[in-house]
Amino acid sequence: MTPLILIAVTAIVFLIGEAIMLPNVMRPLFVKIIGGQMLDSLRLGPAALFYIVHIGGLTWFATLPGLRDGSATAALLNGAILGFVAYACYEFTSWTIMKEWSVQLVIADMVWGSAISGLSAYVAVRVAQAFA
């Protein structure tokens, strides 16, 4: 039952954060910099695949070890590191191949990925600890 709590809480926190941040901060920033290269609406399939893979990674590498060790702080750190790595891969690849990419996008997205991933992992472990 505990792994399901970790997965569910991680997903809820992550998706709420994304639902707030993406339309209000990240999309306007991306539109400003890469403008016409963006789709009018999201491709939900690839987005869902990212969320499944990333939340699975957060569960395996951050929340399960954090819960096992009794440390939500370790989950936060490991989650932030995984978020940094995941978002850095995307950003550095995009910066390498896209004409209109910028260091501003790279920094903003990597900071966001680190923060939301760490926060999601931390909250998930705290909630799971409360139910243990």
Feature locations, PLM:
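Juxtamembrane/disordered regions of integral membrane proteins
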Residues: 1-132
